């Protein structure tokens, strides 16, 4: 995520695209700090929702910062690869599924970590996809082929009459309502010259009413069904909800510190505080149900994070 910050003494800040204020036809730049945040998507029974609980937050400095320091720049995918190795070291016996946006749909990242974690990300609709190489042995000399025949691109499958679409009703769409969508899926090798090929399952999602743009997804676990992949990806929206909650209630983006160490410590601590407050609220709810604070213009059937913060503050 992007923490919007200004200041000449903030060394690690950079100029990035503001995903909230930008659109396909309008590009908005913003100054700030880029953070890579790993969260646990966990169901919260008393909130009747899935919440994203941060437990590891890493600063990804800008390219300009590394150039001034005389260091090699680490891209966002490099930080993500290092985090995956650390997570696998912590939890070697767990099946780990990481859901991310299109920034993590990087061929080198998926190839380096697919033996440790399963990636589900938004995919490039113009990615070069190939069939698997033939398994039979060939008599001609040379190294065996790394890929087979090239498949048609995903954007071409949207209009191909041979594409088989399946209509599925998802009970937890982005607005928490039932939504009927059409999905198509297949298995392919994602390959670029000079890069290791990665077997993926691609999923295309389109709105039968034509109101929403098509959504391409990819998953590095070929055993997951297309419906499971879409259901996992829909949970990613809770990550954006957590970012908004920490901005509104925990003071992220309102800090005034500028030294390197204070920046490295404060924002990860505030992100982790979201998870700590949730655990405290869960303990309080086991003793007595949390109070749901209502407003005149909106009815809340279940407690939200603001109610959890209020309950914890009252107990403290």
Predicted segment positions?
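Single, function-defining residue in the core of a domain
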Residues: 5-10, 49-316
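Active-site-proximal, Lys/Arg-enriched surface segment
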Residues: 1-51, 57, 171, 185-190
């Amino acid at each position: 995520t992007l923490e919007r910050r200004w200041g000449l003494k903030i060394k690690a800040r950079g100029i990035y695209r503001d995903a909230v204020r930008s659109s396909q036809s309008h590009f908005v730049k913003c100054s700030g700090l880029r953070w890579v945040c790993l969260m646990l998507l966990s169901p919260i029974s008393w909130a009747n929702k899935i919440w994203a609980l941060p437990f590891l937050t890493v600063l990804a400095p800008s390219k300009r910062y590394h150039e001034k320091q005389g260091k090699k720049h680490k891209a966002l995918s490099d930080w993500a690869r290092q985090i995956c190795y650390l997570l696998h070291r912590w939890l070697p016996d767990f099946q780990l599924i990481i859901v991310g946006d299109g920034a993590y749909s990087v061929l080198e990242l998926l190839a380096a970590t697919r033996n440790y974690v399963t990636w589900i990300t938004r995919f490039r609709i113009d990615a070069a996809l190939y069939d698997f190489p033939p398994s039979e042995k060939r008599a001609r000399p040379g190294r065996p082929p790394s890929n087979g025949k090239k498949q048609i691109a995903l954007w071409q499958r949207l209009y191909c009459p041979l594409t088989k679409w399946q209509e599925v009703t998802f009970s937890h769409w982005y607005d928490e309502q039932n939504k009927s969508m059409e999905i198509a899926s297949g298995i392919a090798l994602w390959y670029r010259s000079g890069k290791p090929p990665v077997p993926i399952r691609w999923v295309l999602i389109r709105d039968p009413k034509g109101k929403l743009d098509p959504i391409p997804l990819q998953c590095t676990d070929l055993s997951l069904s297309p419906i499971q992949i879409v259901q996992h990806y829909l949970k990613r929206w809770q990550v954006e909800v957590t970012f908004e909650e920490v901005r509104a209630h925990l003071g992220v983006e309102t800090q005034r510190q500028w030294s390197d160490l204070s920046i490295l410590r404060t924002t990860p601590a505030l992100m982790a505080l979201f998870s700590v407050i949730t655990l405290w609220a869960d303990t309080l709810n086991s003793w007595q149900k949390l109070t749901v604070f209502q407003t005149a213009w909106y009815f809340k059937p279940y407690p939200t994070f603001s109610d959890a913060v209020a309950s914890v503050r009252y107990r403290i």
